[in-house]
């Protein structure tokens, strides 16, 4: 996963060349991490020196939780790299609609919705205006993070279900 993400994705530009590279990696990561979590619990279940006899359902839950924890830790890593080293591991997303309470004129919690965003203009410290010409609002990572966690979830659920069926029928 790290080789595919960092070497192929970042250095060889697979994230740009293949639009769904990131989605595929995070889905696969969810699946594989659930497999690792499941295998670890299964090894403990089968070990005669350890008095552990977990049900297939509980094994599937542990595998799912293991996978999601690894996914969250990876997103923490991406966020840290972006903040500390000014990288762009949490890929930007172009949005045409945003919803924010920061623009509520009453400074309350009413979400103000802005639709049809076509461009963002940056105003630099010296007053220089720089239109980005991106065709929308530049979201700097939250949409990517949530998509990554969602597809990790899908991969984890799929493997956990397979693992449950495997142990239940063995």
Enumerate the language-model features and the residues they cover.
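Hydrophobic alpha-helical transmembrane segments
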Residues: 61-64, 150
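Alpha-helical transmembrane segments of multi-pass membrane proteins
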Residues: 2-6, 63, 67-74, 78
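Transmembrane alpha-helical insertion/packing segments
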Residues: 1-39
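Membrane-interfacial alpha-helical segments at the cytosolic side of multi-pass membrane proteins
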Residues: 28-45, 83-89, 154-167
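Interfacial helix-loop-helix junctions of multi-pass membrane proteins
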Residues: 11-22, 71-72, 76-159
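Canonical alpha-helical transmembrane segment with a positive-inside/aromatic-interface signature
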Residues: 43-60
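A structural motif
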Residues: 36-48, 122-130
């Amino acid at each position: 996963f790290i080789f595919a993400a960092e070497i192929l994705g970042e250095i060889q530009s697979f994230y740009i060349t293949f639009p769904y590279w990131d989605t595929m990696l995070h889905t696969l990561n969810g699946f594989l991490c659930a497999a690792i979590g499941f295998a670890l619990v299964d090894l403990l279940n089968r070990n005669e020196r350890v008095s552990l006899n977990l049900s297939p359902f509980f094994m599937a839950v542990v595998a799912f939780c293991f996978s999601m924890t690894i996914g969250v830790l990876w997103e923490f890593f991406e966020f840290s790299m972006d903040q500390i080293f000014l990288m762009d591991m949490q890929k930007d997303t172009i949005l045409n609609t945003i919803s924010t309470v920061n623009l509520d004129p009453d400074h309350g919690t009413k979400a103000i919705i802005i639709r049809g965003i076509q461009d963002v203009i940056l105003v630099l410290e010296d007053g220089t205006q720089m239109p980005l010409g991106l065709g929308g609002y530049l979201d700097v990572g939250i949409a990517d993070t949530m998509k990554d966690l969602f597809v990790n979830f899908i991969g984890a659920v799929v493997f956990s279900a397979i693992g449950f069926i495997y142990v239940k029928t063995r």
